[in-house]
């Protein structure tokens, strides 16, 4: 481990003491947003400090065992301890490097996942429904909660567009790399000749704004329209103007919700989606600036980036950003995204590490 990284890890103990002092301050405890943020940081930093202390202890154990190699009666025991200590150090070294990487401030947030059908007509809408189901199944595997915020259903039961609200531990951290263009290659249900078609959808993953969020929605800049809900929901929902569409006039961003019978709840949900879209707009602008300075391997999350292909005839999934190919398409579409997400996170961590080491 480099002296620079050791210095960074040693500083974490000082930061932990600062957080403990802040959490003991009654003024800080009265500020819910600050308290929540500090508690999250405390959990992360305390785990990092604990690993660093174990690393230092195992270094001492290794040095002690190496000194015993010259004593014949202790040599065999020393060699066993050296092997165990080195294995622990290698594992802790990897864990510490990962934990030391700069974290996205939005990683701990819930997320909205917006899926829009693109090229391919009805087949694209059916693929959008497949993607929505994939994310819902993955959320179920992780123990996350989900809500359907809005949907526009196609003639064959696909989605022209759909917005999912996914709630749980570090949802955005796991799903943020899903933003971009998703392409499918398969024989559509509507294809009589058995020919393979290519269709596409776009996915946008937006971090949810906190209740006491920095995004302020000026009522004077909002146009709120109500209309009669369409689609599933029964007779009652179609007899009232319960659906709500909110337009942010300065940017033209729109959010709508029609899936609750209560106009008030639909409005609250639409405003939550709009706040997330405004935050994402700022995030995308910053990402564009960063991209001008350096080219990220996994991309910026730009919706125009084609990130992944799902090839049904071959049972193949290919993530083009990291040249990852898996022949387990069925499992992935059933929500088994862990290997894909893990590979993307590892690629991002490797980029960050390379950047961090240049600062040493």
From Swiss-Prot:
**Family annotation (SUPFAM superfamilies):** Release factor
Q: Which Gene3D superfamilies does its entry note?
A: 3.30.160.20, 3.30.70.1660, 6.10.140.1950
Query: Main location per UniProt?
Result: cytoplasm
Tell me the compartments it is located in: Cytoplasm
Residue positions, PTM N5-methylglutamine: 235
Modifications made to the protein after synthesis: Methylated by PrmC. Methylation increases the termination efficiency of RF1.
Q: Which UniProt keywords apply?
A: Cytoplasm, Methylation, Protein biosynthesis
Query: Per UniProt, what is one GO molecular function of this protein?
Result: translation release factor activity, codon specific
- Entry's Gene Ontology cellular component terms: cytoplasm
Protein family according to the UniProt entry? Belongs to the prokaryotic/mitochondrial release factor family.
Q: What does this protein do?
A: Peptide chain release factor 1 directs the termination of translation in response to the peptide chain termination codons UAG and UAA.
Q: Which NCBIfam families match?
A: prfA, PRK00591.1
Protein name, please? Answer: Peptide chain release factor 1
Its source organism is Leptothrix cholodnii (strain ATCC 51168 / LMG 8142 / SP-6)
List the lineage, top down: Bacteria, Pseudomonadati, Pseudomonadota, Betaproteobacteria, Burkholderiales
